[in-house]
């Protein structure tokens, strides 16, 4: 999956690839020649200390920030200049950290709002709706208003709604922020479920320990560059990663 310079190739299907991304804000260089790749059916972490550039890389992949240099491709198609909504139409889903449920709609209405933009046939829309209600055990909530949901119920509805567009990749922004251990387990189960569906998952989060327990591999950014890429145990064992990010006492 890499070229002669060790960077991800951009001509392969089944991959979401960022190649040699760079970004500056004024005179401050935030991202320097960052290349990452996510394959369908795997979970990848995008981690690093504050100011490492991970949030900027994440938002460039989403389509919210335009890179100064480099490219982004999906299934071999360059999407670098496409906005967020067009990337969504091509198969990139996004689950923000903040609540994103449509508060004035029922659970059924939340999911159907997405299906109506992605599925043409009425019968197929309703079949997909019923399948998602069952898949996420929210059928009993179908008529409930979004405002009446608990935090866990709301999250399940948001995930079901995100999957209504049939994404090939899901970008999870800080999914572990401020949640209790039970909810961490729910996120772990969610990521496993997405992988079983053949969906590639990219996670950025400040909770490095729990993220490394969830992902198959991760990229560690430092001062705007990729410091290391590898499996969680390889990252934890790396002396330089420990020095600048994890600390000597870190363990999984």
Annotate each PLM feature.
Residues 62:
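Helix-to-loop junction immediately C-terminal to a conserved catalytic motif
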Residues 112, 123-141, 189-192:
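Conserved ABC ATPase "signature" region
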Residues 145-149, 153:
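Conserved ABC ATPase signature
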Residues 166:
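Conserved catalytic motifs of ABC-family nucleotide-binding domains
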Residues 170-174:
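Catalytic Walker B motif of ABC-type/P-loop ATPase nucleotide-binding domains
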């Amino acid at each position: 999956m890499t070229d002669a310079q060790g960077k991800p190739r951009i001509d392969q299907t089944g991959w979401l690839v960022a190649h040699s991304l760079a970004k500056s804000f004024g005179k401050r260089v935030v991202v320097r020649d960052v290349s990452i790749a996510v394959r369908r059916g795997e979970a990848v972490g995008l981690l690093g200390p504050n100011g490492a550039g991970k949030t900027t890389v994440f938002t460039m992949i989403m389509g919210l920030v335009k890179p100064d240099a480099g490219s982004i491709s999906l299934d071999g198609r360059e999407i670098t200049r496409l906005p967020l909504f067009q990337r969504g139409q091509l198969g990139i889903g996004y689950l923000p950290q903040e609540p994103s449920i449509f508060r004035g709609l029922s659970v059924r209405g939340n999911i159907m709002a997405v299906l109506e933009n992605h599925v043409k046939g009425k019968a197929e829309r309703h079949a997909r709706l019923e399948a998602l209600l069952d898949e996420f055990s929210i059928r009993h909530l179908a008529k409930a208003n979004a405002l009446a949901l608990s935090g866990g119920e709301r999250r399940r509805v948001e995930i079901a709604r995100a999957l209504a567009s049939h994404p090939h990749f899901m970008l999870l922004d800080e999914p572990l922020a401020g949640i209790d251990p039970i909810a961490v387990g729910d996120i772990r189960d969610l990521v496993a479920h997405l992988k079983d569906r053949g969906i590639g998952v990219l996670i950025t989060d400040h909770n490095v320990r729990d993220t490394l327990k969830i992902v198959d591999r991760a990229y560690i950014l430092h001062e705007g560059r990729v410091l290391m890429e590898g499996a969680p145990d390889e990252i934890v064992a790396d002396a330089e990663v420990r020095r600048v990010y994890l600390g000597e006492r870190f363990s999984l």
